[in-house]
Curated annotation (Swiss-Prot):
The modification Cysteine sulfenic acid (-SOH) is found at C284. Keywords: Metal-binding, NAD, NADP, Oxidation, Oxidoreductase, Potassium. K(+) 2 binds at L244, K454, G457. This is Betaine aldehyde dehydrogenase. Its cofactor is K(+).
Length: 487
């Protein structure tokens, strides 16, 4: 098999196999071929991983942030040196086109290691509080053993986005990738240990929906960070609440992308396409509700249709390919069902709407699809599809579109295209979302916080803000004089 790892799990600095676990077959989404066969973690494997993390963490926490940072920066360098190899593995794992993975996946993970490796002393600083003769100070201390649970759309990136802040803050991590994309995180663990990370600090175990509760409910776990769906988030939050664990969650979205009539139309069309079709639409922050002001709707749709129909669908390993397959057959069937629902509920099909005929019949392909004349009540305008399906809605004025944009249980992200920057700032101030773009979309460099509100989660990935979620504040009061007691 072309991508078979040495073993299913990476624990305490080495590969570990346990064939008693349920078999997980990794399939190449472009062909359905089995490229690796792994095993889900048994309870014994979960215990082994958490025990390794718990044992290694105190000594790691005692190191200086600068020393920890040097290791992360070495890992970043190794990832960049092996970008092609890692990108090809990511394409095999996810089906995303190599033209995307080579610029957006391992490189983003390397950026996270470099960023957190370089900012640790400043990001973990406390404060001094003068209190007259006395004073107090605060310091940030690690939480202990952290669990990361990844999604299948950006497996390598997510492993790094969670691992980097956890490690630099002095924690140990047990990371569980999605069973759909089990391969990339193992390579990240390899690279971290090659860079000098002590054993036991970054462990990877495979698993399915039965494995997560073993991690979340474990008494030695201090914090859980999840990237996933809203239903999964609710289950994890409920389980973690029983032992008052720290929790951060980056969940789903149904984000609005608003195009006003003074916007640069080609840029707005490009933003809408990036916000719906990148990674075959499998991006949580996608602006899948595209609100277009009525005066430009016809021209917007004309340009959008032409550019969408010109996209190249095909072999993800071909650098010319722009649209690859969905991650799995089940996800393809889900997306196709939503497309049929859009047709049945009366939306106007502008482009796509079916299965492309120029690709392997065994692959999990869906055409990039655009619907117009979508209303707020339609299923495709309310529910997260997680595929290349764009809904175009029209609007008259600013107040109307803000009200409609906010009428969603989700609040992950949103965007505004307009030449009027005063209006742009006014609109984003009123949008109920955690991450917003003006005249851009879906750009998420590690220097800025990323996360949502409402049902889209809480907490932030990346930036110095992430360190607050992997540490806690300790306050120390220092008395400088005699203690006066009233008795």
């Amino acid at each position: 098999m072309k991508a078979q790892p040495k073993a299913s799990h990476f624990i305490d600095g080495e590969y570990v196999e346990d064939s008693d676990g349920t078999v997980i077959e990794s399939l190449y989404p472009a062909t359905g071929e089995v490229i690796a066969r792994l095993h889900a973690a048994t309870p014994a494997i979960v215990e082994k991983a958490i025990a390794a993390a718990k044992s290694a963490q105190p000594e790691w926490a005692a190191m200086s942030p600068m020393a920890r940072g040097r290791i992360l920066k070495r890992a970043a360098d190794i990832m960049r040196e092996r970008n092609r190899e890692l990108s090809e593995l990511e394409t095999l794992d996810t089906g995303k086109p190599i033209q995307e993975t080579i610029v957006a996946d391992p490189t983003s993970g390397a950026d996270a290691f470099e960023f957190f490796g370089g900012v640790a002393p400043a990001g973990l600083n406390g404060s001094h509080i003068p209190l007259g003769q006395d004073f107090a100070y605060t310091k940030r201390v690690p939480l202990g053993v952290c669990v990361g649970i990844g999604a299948w759309n950006y497996p390598q990136q997510i492993a790094c986005w969670k691992g980097a802040p956890a490690l630099i803050a002095g924690n140990a991590m047990v990371f569980k990738p999605s069973e759909n994309t089990p391969l990339g995180a193992l390579k990240i663990a390899e690279i971290l240990h090659e860079a000098g990370l002590p054993k036991g600090l970054f462990n990877v175990i495979q698993g399915d929906r039965d494995t997560g509760p073993l991690l979340v409910n474990h008494p030695d776990v201090a914090k859980v960070s999840l990237t996933g769906s809203v239903p999964t988030g609710r289950r994890v939050a409920a389980a973690a609440a029983g032992s008052l664990k720290h929790v951060t969650m980056e969940l789903g979205g149904k984000s609005p992308l608003i195009v006003f009539d003074d916007a640069d139309l080609d840029s707005a069309v490009g933003g809408a396409m990036l916000g719906n079709f990148y990674s075959t639409g499998q991006v949580c922050s996608n602006g899948t509700r595209v609100f277009v002001q009525k005066g430009i709707k016809t021209e917007f749709l004309k340009r959008l249709k032409a550019r969408t129909e010109a996209m190249l669908i095909g072999d993800p390993m071909d650098e010319a390919t722009q649209i690859g397959p969905m991650v799995s057959w089940a996800q393809r069937e889900k997306v196709v069902a939503y497309i049929e629902k859009g047709k049945a509920e009366g939306a106007t099909l502008v482009a796509g709407g079916g299965i492309p005929n120029n690709v392997s019949g065994e692959g999990y392909y869906v055409q990039p699809t655009v619907f117009a004349d979508v209303t707020d009540e339609m299923t495709i305008a309310r529910e997260e599809i997680f595929g290349p399906v764009m809904s175009v809605l029209d609007f008259d004025d600013e107040d109307e579109v803000i009200t409609r944009a906010n009428a969603s249980e989700f609040g992950l992200s949103g965007g505004v295209f307009t030449a009027d920057l005063t209006r742009a700032h006014r609109v984003v101030d009123r949008l109920e979302a955690g991450t917003l773009w003006i005249n851009a979309y879906n750009l998420a460099p590690v220097e800025i916080p990323f996360g949502g509100s409402k049902q889209s989660g809480f907490g932030r990935e990346n930036s110095l803000a992430a360190l607050e979620h992997y540490s806690e504040l300790k306050t120390v009061y220092v008395g400088m004089g005699p203690v006066q007691a009233p008795y």
